[in-house]
Amino acid sequence: MIAVYPGSFDPITLGHLDIIERGCNLFGSVIVAVARNPNKAPLFSVQQRIQQIQTCTQHLANLELDTFDTLTVTYTQKRQAQVLLRGLRALSDFEYELQMAHTNHSLSPHIETVFLATSNEYSFLSSSLVKEIAKFGGSVAHLVPENVAIELEECFTKTPPSVSIPPPTAPSTPTD
């Protein structure tokens, strides 16, 4: 059985990697499909994201990497996959993902969505959070694969965030 795990993976986190590894244990083949979204300005190019994922998933023999720029369900049909694999971190994820699963099912009834609950240690983790921490010089080594942590550090040491700090004001003196 073929499963597609779609996402932007900008960048891949240990939470994503957890879902990928567990998916590879459940399905005969897992395709990690990196989305090309023209409406978003990603930190890393699609090629960089593919390379990041490839580097940290070399140990998974039944994994394939690909890109797509269509509806997820259309891509899944094209790849003749039977399953859309999704990770759930919190109840808020479930509400959105359930809506998407129903929509995808209405478009392609033979494709099932399988939800995997994220492992507890990654339940708070998102790519946006990782980028925010890295942007302000915090360590993300415990949140992303080692190769990604290095790339994030390189990215943000080249272009540190601009923070505008107002100049100090002179203390006011009381007038009589």
Curated annotation (Swiss-Prot):
Kindly give the InterPro entries that the UniProt entry links to this protein: Cyt_trans-like (IPR004821), PPAT (IPR001980), Rossmann-like_a/b/a_fold (IPR014729)
UniProtKB keywords: ATP-binding, Coenzyme A biosynthesis, Cytoplasm, Magnesium, Nucleotide-binding, Nucleotidyltransferase, Transferase
The Swiss-Prot or TrEMBL record annotates one GO molecular function as: pantetheine-phosphate adenylyltransferase activity
Q: What's an example GO cellular component term for this entry?
A: cytoplasm
Q: Which reaction does it catalyse?
A: (R)-4'-phosphopantetheine + ATP + H(+) = 3'-dephospho-CoA + diphosphate
Biological processes annotated in GO? coenzyme A biosynthetic process
Q: What class of enzyme is it?
A: transferase
Asked if the Swiss-Prot or TrEMBL record annotates the protein with the keyword Nucleotidyltransferase, the reply is yes
- Where would you find this protein in the cell? Cytoplasm
User: Do the record's keywords include Nucleotide-binding?
Assistant: yes
Which pathway does the record list?
Answer: Cofactor biosynthesis; coenzyme A biosynthesis; CoA from (R)-pantothenate: step 4/5
The record's section on Pfam families has: CTP_transf_like
Subunit arrangement? Homohexamer.
Entry similarity comment = Belongs to the bacterial CoaD family.
Q: Which NCBIfam families match?
A: coaD_prev_kdtB (TIGR01510), cyt_tran_rel (TIGR00125)
Question: What is this protein's function?
Answer: Reversibly transfers an adenylyl group from ATP to 4'-phosphopantetheine, yielding dephospho-CoA (dPCoA) and pyrophosphate.
Put simply, this protein is called: Phosphopantetheine adenylyltransferase
- The organism encoding this protein is Acaryochloris marina (strain MBIC 11017)
